[in-house]
Amino acid sequence: MTTPFVLAVPSKGRLQENAEAFFARAGLTLSKLGGARDYRGTIAGLDNVEIAYLSASEIAAQLARGTVHLGITGEDLIRESIADADKKVALIEGLGFGGANVVVAVPQAWIDVRTMADLDDVTTGFRAQHNRRMRVATKYINLTRNFFAAHGVVDYRIVESAGATEGAPAVGTAEMIVDITSSGATLVANGLKVLDDGVILRSQANLVASRAADWSADALETARVILDRIAARARANKYKEVRTRFAGCDASLLTEAHNRFGVVSPFGGPTSSGMITLHCPPAQLYALGSFLRDHGADTVSIASLDYVLDRENPLFAKLESFLRQ
């Protein structure tokens, strides 16, 4: 029996909803085997794929161990929980949801502390005055240590946080925090501010590949199929299809359209009758339409694209390159 290809997906909340919607847009329908409470699932039409519904943090751990081939999780969890992450996993594609920043935040009352250099001065002075180090509340222990070391900040100690990190300075369990934030509103509500150069990581959900997984020929082919559909949808999102026909449509006009509007002609130049199909960035549609009509087109049609399949698949090429390293 062939070993299944394992794809790990967040098991609850907005991340699960967004992940399933992402795959659905690529024509990959996920379903749970035993209903909403089951933690196993399938993809319609791909019988050898097993969906593992896990927490985002567990997905990062399983990617490191190689028990899943691909998984969706936040880059913050990858960077925090996997040492030398770039050698063990590959971030195949940022997915545009689950966005948040890991930041260094200090009390707003520290009006003279705006940068990491200022923080270095304050922590050194604090230790000299109080004979102890400043406390940093965080669950991002490794990211904090690496970032502080890169900025030469050494006079601090980490207080591991399991709950509402942003409240630690107010209740006196820490002087400052490192935490993840989307809008910053919660930090402000707790009397905190982000240092000007205190963004450690701009994170989002990623489709991640594991080096340690069993990448058999069958597994690679399954990955190619999945990534081909994702890439086809991503290409379609970049463009609208523009079609027209007029006698003055020639190669020089297409070159000008490409240079001015970023269009591509996926099927080559115009036919003998002047028929042409173009792919155009959405922001340039009306400018391109005016340009074509100014040069002789009577009618220009514009349509949305569902998928654009291409011989080259940059996502699968990225996976292959990573596995060869």
Curated annotation (Swiss-Prot):
Q: What does this protein do?
A: Catalyzes the condensation of ATP and 5-phosphoribose 1-diphosphate to form N'-(5'-phosphoribosyl)-ATP (PR-ATP). Has a crucial role in the pathway because the rate of histidine biosynthesis seems to be controlled primarily by regulation of HisG enzymatic activity.
The record's GO molecular-function terms, alphabetically, read: ATP binding; ATP phosphoribosyltransferase activity; magnesium ion binding
**PROSITE patterns per the UniProt record, alphabetical:** ATP_P_PHORIBOSYLTR
| Gene3D superfamilies assigned | Periplasmic binding protein-like II
Q: What is its EC number?
A: 2.4.2.17
**SUPFAM superfamilies named in the record:** Periplasmic binding protein-like II
Q: Which GO terms describe its biological process?
A: L-histidine biosynthetic process
Q: In which pathway does it act?
A: Amino-acid biosynthesis; L-histidine biosynthesis; L-histidine from 5-phospho-alpha-D-ribose 1-diphosphate: step 1/9
Give the similarity note: Belongs to the ATP phosphoribosyltransferase family. Long subfamily.
Location in the cell: Cytoplasm
Give cofactor(s), names only. Mg(2+)
Please state how the activity of this protein is regulated: Feedback inhibited by histidine.
Question: What EC class does the entry list?
Answer: transferase
Q: Would you tell me the protein name for this molecule?
A: ATP phosphoribosyltransferase
Q: Which reaction does it catalyse?
A: 1-(5-phospho-beta-D-ribosyl)-ATP + diphosphate = 5-phospho-alpha-D-ribose 1-diphosphate + ATP
HAMAP family assigned to the protein according to its UniProt record, in alphabetical order:
HisG_Long
Q: What is the lineage of its organism?
A: Bacteria, Pseudomonadati, Pseudomonadota, Alphaproteobacteria, Hyphomicrobiales
